[in-house]
Swiss-Prot record:
Signal peptide: 1-18
Function of the molecule: May be involved in iversification of muscle cell fates.
Organism: Drosophila melanogaster (Fruit fly)
Compartments (UniProt record): Secreted
InterPro entries: PA_dom_sf (IPR046450), PA_domain (IPR003137), PRADC1-like_PA (IPR037323)
Record-given protein name: PRADC1-like protein
Swiss-Prot/TrEMBL keywords: Glycoprotein, Secreted, Signal
Pfam families reported in the protein's UniProt record: PA
Length: 196
C-alpha cells in the first residue's frame, strides 16, 4: 500500500510540475537589447529592417533620426586611407568593410569625408565573425569620433553591397534609427536570408 501511495505521489508531482511551466513570450525589447535598427527604403530588393550593434565606447549615440539619407559604400571599402568618394558620402551614412585598421579609424575617416554615421560590416564569408555581431571598441588612441558607428552582420553587408553593385547604384536610401519599441517581433520586416 505504501508503494502505491509513493507511485501516486510521484505521478501527481510530475503532472503538477509539467502543468506549471511558465511560457514567457519574446518581446521586442528582448530582441532590441540595446541595438539600433535601420530600414532601407530603396532599392526595393533591399527594403528590410536591419540590426546594428552600436560602438561600445567611441563615437556618439544614434540619437538623431536621419530620414531618406544615402547609405554609401566607401572607396576604398575598408576606409583605412582617405575616402575617395567623399562627394557621394557627404551627408550620408558610410558602409565600410571590417579589417586592416581599427573601427575608430574607419569611423574617423568617414566623419572626415562628411558622413553622418558609419556602418561597419564583415565582408569575408569564411571569417568566423561573418554571422556574429562584434563589439566595436575604442583603439586606445587619443582620438574620438563625433558621429555614431555600428556593426552590421556580414551577411547583410555582403548582400547590400552586391545588390547595389549589381544594380549599378551609388547608394541605397535609409532611415536610421528606426524605433521598434512597440512593434511586435512578428511584424519586424527583417531580411528573409537571416531567418530570425
Amino acid at each position: 500500500m505504501l508503494i502505491a501511495w509513493l507511485v501516486l505521489a510521484a505521478t501527481l508531482s510530475r503532472s503538477i510540475r509539467a502543468s506549471t511551466t511558465i511560457s514567457i513570450p519574446i518581446t521586442t525589447q528582448d530582441i532590441i537589447a540595446g541595438d539600433v535598427f535601420f530600414e532601407i527604403l530603396s532599392p526595393s530588393e533591399l527594403e528590410y529592417t536591419y540590426r546594428l550593434r552600436p560602438a561600445k565606447d567611441f563615437g556618439s549615440a544614434f540619437s538623431e533620426r536621419l530620414e531618406g539619407v544615402p547609405l554609401v559604400i566607401t572607396d576604398p571599402p575598408g576606409a583605412c586611407q582617405e575616402i575617395r568618394n567623399a562627394r557621394d558620402l557627404n551627408g550620408g551614412v558610410a558602409l565600410i568593410d571590417r579589417g586592416e585598421c581599427s573601427f575608430l579609424t574607419k569611423t574617423l575617416r568617414a566623419e572626415a569625408a562628411g558622413a553622418l554615421a558609419a556602418i561597419i560590416t564583415e565582408y569575408n564569408p569564411s571569417s568566423p565573425e561573418f554571422e556574429h555581431y562584434i563589439e566595436m571598441i575604442h583603439d586606445n588612441s587619443q582620438q574620438d569620433a563625433n558621429i555614431p558607428a555600428g556593426f552590421l552582420l556580414g551577411k547583410n553587408g555582403v548582400i547590400i553591397r552586391s545588390t547595389l553593385q549589381r544594380l549599378k547604384r551609388v547608394h541605397a536610401l535609409i532611415n536610421i534609427p528606426v524605433n521598434l519599441t512597440f512593434t511586435p517581433p512578428s511584424k519586424i520586416n527583417h531580411p528573409p536570408w537571416l531567418g530570425w
